[in-house]
């Protein structure tokens, strides 16, 4: 009798252990699913294309008004629309402003969810003053360029090479070419620096590019997701 009771007790313990293991496994699988879905939602929130309208002009007495009116003026100036195919087949577009034939060329890459005209106001003015030519590029998944997702430099760095190759072929190997980017664009041109460019690509200018994609994602998660949601 005692032996039978002992066996029943052992059996009950075994069943309890199996239940605990089953619960742990289910919770683990559930956590993985939640993590996967959450990661996808965060990625979509940050990196998916948005058909962002141009910012409102604001009022005539603020700094934004002056900046955006300059951007609108640049957009309306005479320029040549350039379309290239990236190495993965994505159509990329930019606008070329010629100040002087055979002058050095600056290929400009805008910032995170930015606009080439808006972010490009300072370099356009400098190029006009120095009599350089400038190409304002719309990065993938922004404005006129194709793509549903941008990758914070993972793919965009190769787009820099494609733009450099196009410029070297179009303007000739004797034309000095510089890549310049601001914010995310700055990080992109820096990330491209170890890739194979034509010899006419002479330099890279990084204006306040982020240091790591991880920090960039963390910053945008905090500003884009609901308050209290862990990042």
Which role fits each region the language model picked out?
Residues 27-84:
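An N-terminal hydrophobic leader/cap segment in hydrolases
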Residues 87-98:
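A short loop-to-beta-strand scaffold at the N-terminal edge of the catalytic core in hydrolase folds
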Residues 103-111:
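Short beta-strand element of the alpha/beta-hydrolase
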Residues 127-146:
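Conserved alpha/beta-hydrolase
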Residues 150-171:
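Alpha/beta-hydrolase active-site loop
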Residues 171-183:
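Alpha/beta-hydrolase fold nucleophile elbow
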Residues 191-231:
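Hydrolase active-site cap/lid region
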């Amino acid at each position: 009798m005692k032996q039978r009771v002992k066996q029943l007790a052992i059996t009950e313990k075994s069943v309890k252990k199996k239940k605990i293991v089953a619960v742990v496994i289910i919770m683990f699988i559930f956590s993985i699913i939640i993590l996967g879905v959450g990661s996808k939602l965060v990625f979509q929130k940050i990196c998916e294309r948005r058909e962002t309208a141009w910012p409102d002009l604001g009022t005539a007495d603020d700094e934004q008004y002056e900046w955006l009116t300059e951007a609108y003026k640049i957009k309306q100036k005479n320029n040549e629309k350039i379309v290239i195919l990236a190495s993965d087949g994505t159509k990329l577009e930019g606008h070329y402003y010629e100040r002087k034939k055979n002058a050095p060329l600056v290929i400009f890459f805008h910032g995170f969810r930015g606009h080439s005209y808006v972010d490009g106001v300072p370099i356009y003015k400098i190029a006009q003053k120095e009599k350089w030519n400038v190409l304002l590029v719309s990065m993938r998944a922004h404005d006129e360029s194709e793509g549903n997702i941008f990758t914070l430099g993972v793919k965009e760095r190769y787009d820099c090479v494609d733009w450099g190759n196009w410029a070297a072929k179009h303007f000739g190997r004797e034309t000095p070419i510089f890549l310049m980017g601001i914010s995310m664009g700055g990080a992109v041109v820096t990330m491209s620096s170890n890739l194979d460019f034509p010899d006419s690509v002479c330099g890279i200018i990084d204006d306040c590019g982020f240091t790591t994609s991880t920090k960039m994602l963390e910053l945008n998660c905090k500003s884009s997701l609901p308050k209290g949601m862990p990042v």
